[in-house]
Amino acid sequence: SGKTTLSKLLMGLYVPEKGSVTIGGRDTSTTDMTSLMKRTGAVFQNFIKYTAMTLSDNVRISSADKKYTPENISYALSECSLDKNDEKTFPEGLETMLGREFNGSELSGGQWQRLAMARGFYRESDWMILDEPTSAIDPLEEDRMYRKFAELANGKTALIITHRLGSARIANRIIVMDSGRIVEEGTHDELLVRKGKYAEMWEAQASGYVI
């Protein structure tokens, strides 16, 4: 608990009751929030489904001022395993209307999550947050997308919030929270050696895959 609240504090969506939030050594309370938001990208667990909009607009809405090309949209979709040429799901390609309105295409929960992730790929922010947006996506596909995000985040800052510890392994720094407090931090290997909360959760999850 407390992980989503922490991510929203870091984005400046919440104001801390005590203490301060700094990014690059600067207190966010004295930072131009418009500038901060333009440099920040986030995909939350409770993402918005933009119905009555085309597939293309669903991706572009994350960065409306970015120069539009069909190739950029198609790339973001393909990195999240969505194919604009899938005639069954997207009969009009990038111009397919989504949602029940206007006889649009109705996506599954996993497809909506992939689309939300595609918006994150398209935005190309300096500071990215992924707050468990992949609960309806299988672990292997989730791991692939997170690793791709890690590539995009090279030289930038990315925060991934997840309960699937297999995905946490790709991080160069893991922070473990329990009851709203930070209880451990380190790399995957360091935390396993310490035999603390992280190691306990890792072993519990791993046991579910051992026959």
Regions found by a protein language model. Give the residues of each.
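C-terminal portion of ABC ATPase nucleotide-binding domains
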Residues: 147, 154, 169-211
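Helix-to-loop junction immediately C-terminal to a conserved catalytic motif
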Residues: 11
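Conserved ABC transporter NBD signature motif
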Residues: 19-27, 36
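Catalytic Walker B motif of ABC-type/P-loop ATPase nucleotide-binding domains
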Residues: 128-132
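Helix N-cap at the start of a conserved alpha-helix in ABC-type nucleotide-binding domains
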Residues: 139-141
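A short, proline-enriched helix->beta-strand linker immediately N-terminal to the Walker B motif
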Residues: 122-126, 155
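Conserved catalytic motifs of ABC-family nucleotide-binding domains
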Residues: 47-68
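ABC-fold ATPase nucleotide-binding domain signature/coupling loops
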Residues: 73, 83-115, 208-211
